[in-house]
Amino acid sequence: MKLRGLYAITDSQLLAGKFLKYVEAALEGGVTLLQYRDKSDDQARRLREAETLLALCERYKTRLIINDDAELAARIGAGVHLGQTDGPLTPARALLGRQAIIGATCHSQLPLAEQAAKEGASYVAFGRFFNSTTKPGAPAASLELLDQARASLHLPICVIGGITLDNAAPLVNHGADLLAVVHGLFGAESAEEVTRRARAFNALFNS
């Protein structure tokens, strides 16, 4: 599977009361990867929601990624995204197998991405590129970093942080393979608008 296009990331607070409706609306518009991001300690609910999302993703031929929880990912047969504080990538690869998608947060540091690539990452994520409500304190990344990463890395590059339809095009033009979007996708007034935004993000890769 080619990892290129929209990478939708859920936010339990933003999607309160409309979680599945908006997620399915995004999938309708086209999502390459869907990340389930929930930082709560309610393990039973997280398992239930992850299994529901997995079934939705299978229907739309999308791959599900679990944020920061390799054990949950292994339990349901999903991929995982690991932050820099979540430990080395190698144990997750051993747990999930060779075919699983494993992503790694690399902030704005190319050496972190090069290390993740050596450890078997499926993709690396840089950001934040713009002001972000999800990660307000994250170090800023630049288009120059993206150019350097594109020249030295031979795996998909994901970009994250305040990405909207108004600012995403330069990121794609500088080599981003995956646009990771939270509020720029799900902060819409209606499910129909979520679908429209998803289609518009994907169109940036074909222009």
UniProtKB/Swiss-Prot annotation:
EC id: 2.5.1.3
Keywords noted in UniProt: Magnesium, Metal-binding, Thiamine biosynthesis, Transferase
InterPro entries with a match to the protein in the record: Aldolase_TIM, ThiamineP_synth_sf, ThiamineP_synth_TenI, TMP_synthase
Sequence intervals crossing the membrane: none
Chain sites annotated for binding 4-amino-2-methyl-5-(diphosphooxymethyl)pyrimidine: Q35, Y36, R37, D38, K39, N67, T105, K135
Required co-factors: Mg(2+)
Pathways involved: Cofactor biosynthesis; thiamine diphosphate biosynthesis; thiamine phosphate from 4-amino-2-methyl-5-diphosphomethylpyrimidine and 4-methyl-5-(2-phosphoethyl)-thiazole: step 1/1
Record GO cellular component, one term: cytoplasm
A GO BP annotation: thiamine biosynthetic process
Transferase as UniProt keyword: yes
Catalytic activity: 2-[(2R,5Z)-2-carboxy-4-methylthiazol-5(2H)-ylidene]ethyl phosphate + 4-amino-2-methyl-5-(diphosphooxymethyl)pyrimidine + 2 H(+) = thiamine phosphate + CO2 + diphosphate; 2-(2-carboxy-4-methylthiazol-5-yl)ethyl phosphate + 4-amino-2-methyl-5-(diphosphooxymethyl)pyrimidine + 2 H(+) = thiamine phosphate + CO2 + diphosphate; 4-methyl-5-(2-phosphooxyethyl)-thiazole + 4-amino-2-methyl-5-(diphosphooxymethyl)pyrimidine + H(+) = thiamine phosphate + diphosphate
Annotated binding of 2-[(2R,5Z)-2-carboxy-4-methylthiazol-5(2H)-ylidene]ethyl phosphate, by residue: S132, T133, T134, G162
CDD domains in alphabetical order: TMP_TenI
Positions of Mg(2+) binding: D68, D86
MF GO annotations: magnesium ion binding; thiamine-phosphate diphosphorylase activity
Function noted in UniProt: Condenses 4-methyl-5-(beta-hydroxyethyl)thiazole monophosphate (THZ-P) and 2-methyl-4-amino-5-hydroxymethyl pyrimidine pyrophosphate (HMP-PP) to form thiamine monophosphate (TMP).
Family classification: Belongs to the thiamine-phosphate synthase family.
HAMAP family per UniProt: TMP_synthase
Protein name, per record: Thiamine-phosphate synthase
Species annotation: Pseudomonas fluorescens (strain ATCC BAA-477 / NRRL B-23932 / Pf-5)
